[in-house]
Amino acid sequence: MESLTIRRQEERKPLAKIDGATIDVDAIWAQMNAPDSKLGLAPIPDAQKQDETPASDTEVRDQENANPTEPNGPAEKGFQQTSEMVKIKRTYKFAGEMITEEKIVPRDSAEAKLFLSGNGDGEVIPVTEDEVANMTGKGNENTSTNNTLRIRRPLRKISRFDPNPSGMIKKSWGKQSLTETGARTGAGQENIRGPKINTVEKSRLDWVAYVDQEGISDELRMHSKAKEGFLGRMDFLNRVDAKKEEERRNARLRGV
């Protein structure tokens, strides 16, 4: 009980006293709350304002220099893109099929470098900005078409236990004669000719296309440099060990 009484007395004590104050606190508080009161935050000196103005101008100037005007940017970018893009046309025979490829790639890409390094069967044509835009539009259309086809529900497959009143299953299972197939294939490939490539060459073409698509050429270059550096260090250490062993052998021979 005594502890509760002491606690209540402490809670009832005032937080501050104004008995010994030399100014009228209530009057000053009322004056500060008055609507026409001039008391408040101190005004900013003129010298400080003058110091802030050049700083803001400098910041604006730096931002203008960092971000150039937009009209020149796209034009320069488009010119650079047009001058570095090339069109690759390639025709080859793989797995019994004649394949014709035509694509626009950057000149410094892995696929373009491989094509320019040792492939004389195709052609490289500098492209313009309009052709790049057209090829990009075709790519987007093909992508949207593929996405549309992916979300379609596949049709129900015909079962041999289903009724067949129209004879469709017999027609689908009918074998075509080899002469008709050969004649049709020969007519289609009569005007298309190209070199025959093996699986290794086809894999190399697919790999460079994948490298350009994923954008990992820089990582592969750094990895190859690191690998060469490791092999070089190992070779150096092996040479040092061989030299030490030779010195030991010479010392033993001199001692004998």
From Swiss-Prot:
Output compositional bias ranges, type Basic and acidic residues.
48-64
The UniProt record lists the BCNT-C domain at: 177-256
Keyword Transcription regulation recorded: yes
* One Gene Ontology CC term in the entry: nucleus
Origin, by domain of life?
A: Eukaryota
User: Matching Pfam families, A to Z?
Assistant: BCNT (PF07572)
Entry keyword set: Activator, Chromatin regulator, Nucleus, Transcription, Transcription regulation
Main localization of the protein described in the UniProt heading: nucleus
Q: Where in the cell is it found?
A: Nucleus
Q: What does this protein do?
A: Component of the SWR1 complex which mediates the ATP-dependent exchange of histone H2A for the H2A variant HZT1 leading to transcriptional regulation of selected genes by chromatin remodeling. Involved in chromosome stability.
Q: What is the protein name stated in its UniProt record?
A: SWR1-complex protein 5
Organism whose genome encodes this protein: Emericella nidulans (strain FGSC A4 / ATCC 38163 / CBS 112.46 / NRRL 194 / M139) (Aspergillus nidulans)
Lineage of origin: Eukaryota, Fungi, Dikarya, Ascomycota, Pezizomycotina
GN (gene name): swc5
